[in-house]
Structure formats: C-alpha cells, structure tokens
C-alpha cells in the first residue's frame, strides 16, 4: 500500500491507531535513525477544537494539513518542532501527530543529538523525538513522505504488535471545550516506557510488545 492510499482510505483516528507499532525512521545523510511508533494523536480537522485547522483556519504555518494525505506537516512551538502527517484528501485538514517512538536504529547518534540524554529520555515525547533525529527546523514541512528522508514502513510483517493499545485523551489540550479535550484520540502501547509521562510502576514486560 502506498502513502497516499494509507493516509486517506479510512478515518484519521483509525489511521492513528494503525500506526502504533510501525517503524518510523529518518535518514540524516549518515545513517538511519528511528524506532517503532508507540504513541500518536489524531486531529480531526475543522470541527476539532484542538486542531490547528479548527473552524477552517488556514495559513502558511498550517498549510501542510490541507495537502493530500501523506504530506509532512512540521510545526514549531518556541524552539521545539513536531512531526505530523496529513490525513484524508486535499483540503480536508486532518492529521496525526507522532508523539513517541521506541528506539531501534541509530540509538547512539540519537543520544548524541539529545546531548547525552539516554534511556526513555531519548524519544519519550514529540519534541524529544525530533531532537533525537537532529531536526531543528521546518525544512521538510510540506514534502510528501516518499520525497523526504522520513519513512513510515507500511509492511505489516515489519510492524511490532502491542499486547494492548490504549485509547485516551490527548495531551495538553485546552479544557475550554471539554468534549474535544476529553475525546479519546491518543493511542499508545500500554506499559511502553517511551510513551510520554508513562510511570515506572506501569512499565510492562518487553516494553508492552508481544
């Protein structure tokens, strides 16, 4: 299955859940960095008060969401950068935010990119993941996945299977609209230590994989 089909052929929350366990990698020109997606959030577009495209808001900053599914949308908050992929057809501005990966490739380089932070601190959050990839700009914003150094491996035989996938509310969402703030649109591997804010007491055997 190609990216255009994968990111448009079902609802955005279904796409987000299916991404759990798939390899996400970034080729920095020297080697492949990355790991298995363990946490991701769906943003449902114009009706979603937490989405950057809520109410049809469109600007150069969020243009990536309006492109066809499979387009990279990188946005910045202060000095931090976040990796999203647009979902659905062009002008239907939905997307998925990848929040965390379980490192598997280029771990030593990712630790170096994180200024020596190791263990769960390498990639247990969306900005940390981008730092681990050595990304400090929006250069790959608006590129289609297949035309970028990013790869999401869609081969099912390369996907790791979680013992349990949890659906929960998204992180850091404004509570002014409790309906959207509390929608269970964040998916993660139960007990995986790289999930943001996972408590040590909740760590699962084998990081939550089967």
From Swiss-Prot:
EC number(s) reported in the record: 3.2.2.-
Gene3D superfamilies, alphabetized: Methylpurine-DNA glycosylase (MPG)
GO biological process: base-excision repair
Gene Ontology MF terms: alkylbase DNA N-glycosylase activity; DNA binding
Pfam families the record matches: Pur_DNA_glyco
TM segment ranges: none
Keywords (A to Z) from UniProt: DNA damage, DNA repair, Hydrolase
Annotated InterPro entries: Formyl_transferase-like_C_sf (IPR011034), MPG (IPR003180), MPG_sf (IPR036995)
Family classification: Belongs to the DNA glycosylase MPG family.
Protein name per UniProt: Putative 3-methyladenine DNA glycosylase
Organism encoding this protein: Lactobacillus acidophilus (strain ATCC 700396 / NCK56 / N2 / NCFM)
